[in-house]
Structures are given as structure tokens and as C-alpha cells.
């Protein structure tokens, strides 16, 4: 896999520039594997991704999608942004407001709680442009319950040797940042969001800028946090969120041929 988990290369406006191509290829320089890949989740939501892949790949790549019950997914997503200091509205308000707006390309605030869970809506484009034999669907629920079997099904899909044992998989833990404002200021500085950071290239050498950026990225002070134990979703809100996704999940089952038995909300 790429040395950077989510390169977001194929979403870039200037993805064909020599600089972007070289940086992307460098993410795989240490790989001696027959198969390489990466895991940028936002590719699922950008139509340009499919157009660009079809244009530049003679042979279709393979896609593995890990889907989670959309009700649980959006609630976890909400608390993730709360912990980062990027959300202060109630969950119900955040979700319903998102459902009322159109989806558009996003940057530092990926608060599409409703839209990200419209799996059938997003996957239809993949099934329309690539053969189903090149698309693998697994669920987070199956990955947690039977990780070895689920991962081996992916290995089989990729035509590589299956595993006999598997080390425990550590799940992501929702946290609350101790200094969220400093954390986001740091991220914006690194991304060059402020005029002063854009102007700095005329005052500081590229080598010095790279050094400072690396120091900021590795400074754990900005990422200081503690576990965030959030409340369970109420039955009333759970029923409401379910109603938003019922038609999409029904279409998802038809599209993929999967029953999604682990999603109890949609299999009563």
C-alpha cells in the first residue's frame, strides 16, 4: 500500500503535473509487491475519479469498499467532528440540515453526515463503469466479527495467497482534542490557507519550508487528546435516521447482491 494512507491524488486539479505524478509515484517506491494500492476514501464521491482512472488505466483496477451500517456511520462521523472541535450543533440538527443541502466538493470540513452514507448512490457509478468482478464489497461489521475470513475474501478477490492467522485489528477510537483551535490553525498553515504562508515562499527557501512543515506535522502537542465516550443513539433518532436511508439500502442490496445481514436496522 502507499506510504501515505490517503494521497487524494486522483482528486487533484493538477494531477497530471510532473510534480504531482512524481510525488504520487514516490509513495510506492519501496514496494516490491506485485499488487499496489491506496485507500483514499473520497474517491468514492468524486465523478472525476472514475473518468480519470478510465482514461489512464489500460486494465481496470480493482476496488474494495468497506461499508458500515449508515445509521452508525453518520453518528460516529458526527462525534468524530465534535471531538475535533469542528461541530457544535446537535446531532439531529447536523444530520437533517445536511440532508437538505446538495453535495459538493469539500475541504477541511467533511460534515456530510447524510450524504456519505448514500452508498448505492455513489456505487452506481462504479458498477456502471467497471465490471462487477472488479468490485468487492465488505462490511465493517463482518470485519469486526470475523476479521480473518473477511480479509481472506479480499485476498481471494485480489488473487493473492490467503492468511492462516491474523494479528488483532485495532479500531479507531473517537477522541476529543485538547487544543482544537491550535490543531486546526496548524492544519491550515500546513495547507497554505493563509496569505502569510503563501508569501513565505519568497522569504524562506524550499528546504527550510519543508523542514518547518515536517516539524509541525510531527509535533504531538497539536494532537494531544483524550478518549471521547459519547452516548448511544436514542431509539427515536435511530428510527429517524433509518428512514432517510431505507430506499438507498434497498437499492444497495439490488446493486451489489449482498444481503447486509449485519445491518439490523434494515433487516427487520
Regions found by a protein language model. Give the residues of each.
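Anion-recognition interface
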Residues: 1-268
Amino acid at each position: 500500500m502507499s506510504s501515505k494512507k490517503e494521497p487524494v491524488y486522483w482528486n487533484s486539479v493538477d494531477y497530471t503535473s510532473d510534480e504531482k505524478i512524481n510525488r504520487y509515484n514516490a509513495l510506492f517506491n519501496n514496494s516490491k509487491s506485485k499488487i499496489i494500492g491506496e485507500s483514499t476514501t473520497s474517491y468514492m464521491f468524486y465523478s472525476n475519479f472514475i473518468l480519470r482512472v478510465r482514461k489512464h488505466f489500460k486494465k481496470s483496477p480493482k476496488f474494495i469498499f468497506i461499508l458500515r451500517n449508515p445509521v452508525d456511520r453518520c453518528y460516529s462521523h458526527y462525534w468524530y467532528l465534535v471531538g475535533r472541535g469542528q461541530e457544535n450543533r446537535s446531532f439531529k440538527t447536523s444530520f437533517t440540515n445536511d440532508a437538505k443541502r446538495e453535495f459538493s466538493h469539500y475541504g477541511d470540513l467533511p460534515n456530510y453526515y447524510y450524504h456519505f452514507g448514500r452508498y448505492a448512490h455513489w456505487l452506481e457509478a462504479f458498477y456502471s463503469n467497471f465490471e462487477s468482478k472488479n468490485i468487492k464489497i465488505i462490511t465493517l461489521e463482518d470485519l469486526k466479527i470475523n476479521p480473518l475470513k473477511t480479509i481472506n475474501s479480499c485476498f481471494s478477490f485480489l488473487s493473492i495467497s490467503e492468511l492462516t492467522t491474523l494479528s488483532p485489528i485495532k479500531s479507531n477510537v473517537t477522541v476529543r482534542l485538547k487544543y482544537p483551535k491550535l490543531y486546526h490553525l496548524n492544519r491550515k498553515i500546513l495547507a497554505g490557507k493563509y496569505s502569510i504562508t503563501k508569501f513565505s515562499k519568497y522569504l524562506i527557501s524550499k528546504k527550510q519550508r519543508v523542514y518547518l512543515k515536517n516539524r509541525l506535522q510531527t509535533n504531538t502537542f497539536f494532537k494531544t487528546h483524550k478518549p471521547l465516550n459519547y452516548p448511544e443513539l436514542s431509539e427515536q433518532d435511530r428510527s429517524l435516521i433509518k428512514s432517510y436511508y431505507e430506499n438507498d439500502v434497498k437499492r444497495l442490496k439490488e446493486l451489489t447482491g449482498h444481503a447486509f445481514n449485519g445491518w439490523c436496522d434494515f433487516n427487520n
